[in-house]
Regions:
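Surface loop/turn signatures of beta-propeller and other carbohydrate-active proteins
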Residues: 5, 26-52, 69, 92-109
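Conserved Ser/Thr-centered positions that define the repeating blades of beta-propeller domains
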Residues: 20-24
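Flexible loop/turn segments at secondary-structure boundaries
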Residues: 10-12, 38-42, 52-54, 61, ...
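Hydrophobic core segments of beta-strands in well-ordered, beta-rich domains
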Residues: 1-11, 16-19, 29-31, 50-54, ...
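Residue-level preference for beta-strand/loop junctions
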Residues: 12-13, 45, 192, 241
């Protein structure tokens, strides 16, 4: 058996530790396989949480959540980050490339994956950051807090880790409405939930009620939302190569898959 464990060293460096065990009761430390100051990352957070190491195709992927990374322009905008490293794992060492954010939205953390009976690698993420805002969430009055993401299938596209809603969600679709051509405005739709496939060009925006807006312009997709605690508008954005955008929305959340799943934005 192999186990990966997120860690924080005594000198505040985040690491992912590898353990090996003949049973699930007794484990032996093999050593760190990734972390701050390792694999060409430089200083990269004081703690790494929630690691998940798995094979996908002919490579291995390590998903983890570093804490203590400062924002860099439009990157690393959340309190804690979540991303992936791809490379080769030989059972003891993990040679990998650069760190990439798994979801560039407001709330996405601690994802875990599993392999299903069809051999697909499926991921669920936790939509629930940051914790200092938890008790101000309006759902607290109704006895619940946070939610899981939709189940996502992971796949490679041009050596990039991509995500898409699992095919089984297609069965939940109801009546279809189609808009074609160039539209300055189209009528508002009163819906509780929707699956939107957007083929866009030029510049424009799509409102979700009065509290969230998806904005597209050359090379960039931006998700704006009104913070429920402060009332201020805040943004997260992603590169956009002009490909299809799929949005899953309901009363509580938005999950946007950009360029056929190359990037995602959740809120």
């Amino acid at each position: 058996w192999l186990m990966v464990l997120g860690a924080r060293t005594l000198d505040d460096r985040g690491e992912v530790l590898l353990y090996r065990g003949d049973t699930l009761d007794v484990w032996t430390l093999v050593g760190p396989i990734a972390g701050s100051g390792r694999g060409g990352l430089g200083e990269f957070g004081y703690m790494w949480e929630c690691p998940d190491l798995f094979p996908l195709g002919d490579r291995h992927v390590l998903i983890s959540c570093p804490q203590g990374i400062a924002p860099q322009g439009e990157d690393y905008r959340n309190l804690y980050q979540c991303g992936w490293l791809a490379g080769h794992f030989d059972g003891a060492q993990f040679e990998h490339g650069a760190f990439h954010e798994l979801d560039r939205g407001f709330e996405f953390y601690a994802p875990q994956t599993t392999q299903d009976s069809q051999g697909r690698r499926l991921l669920f993420g936790w939509l629930g950051l940051p914790e200092e805002n938890e008790m101000s969430q309006p759902t607290v009055a109704h006895g619940w807090l946070h939610q899981m993401s939709c189940p996502r299938e992971l796949f490679w596209q041009d050596e990039w880790l991509c995500q898409r809603p699992v095919a089984e969600l297609e069965a939940l679709k109801g009546e279809r409405t189609r808009f074609e051509g160039t539209l300055g405005e189209f009528p508002g739709l009163a819906i509780d939930s929707a699956w939107l496939d957007l083929d866009l060009c030029g510049e424009g925006s799509l409102w979700f009620g009065a509290v969230a807006e998806l904005v597209w312009q050359q090379g960039r997709i931006t998700l704006r939302r009104q913070n429920w605690q402060r009332g201020a508008w805040e943004t997260r954005s992603s590169p956009w190569a002009g490909g299809r955008i799929t949005v899953l929305c309901d009363r509580s959340s938005l999950e946007c898959f950009i360029d056929e799943g190359r990037h995602s934005l959740s809120a």
